[in-house]
């Protein structure tokens, strides 16, 4: 099992999570 693979998947997951939270934050700020 490659450490780099895990790190890559994890950072991808974090980016998606952050993007979703950012969109929610934008929605809440605009309304």
Curated annotation (Swiss-Prot):
The keyword Secreted appears for this protein: yes
A single MF term (Gene Ontology): hormone activity
GO cellular component labels: extracellular region
The keyword Secreted appears for this protein: yes
Signals that turn on the gene: Produced in the A cells of the islets of Langerhans in response to a drop in blood sugar concentration.
UniProt function note: Glucagon plays a key role in glucose metabolism and homeostasis. Regulates blood glucose by increasing gluconeogenesis and decreasing glycolysis.
Family classification: Belongs to the glucagon family.
Transmembrane segments: none
Compartments (UniProt record): Secreted
Pfam families, per the entry: Hormone_2
SMART domains (UniProt xref): GLUCA (SM00070)
UniProt main location, coarse: secreted
Record keywords: Hormone, Secreted
Name of this chain's protein: Glucagon-5
């Amino acid at each position: 099992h490659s450490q780099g693979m895990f790190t890559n998947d994890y950072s991808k997951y974090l980016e998606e999570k952050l993007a979703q939270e950012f969109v929610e934050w934008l929605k809440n700020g605009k309304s």
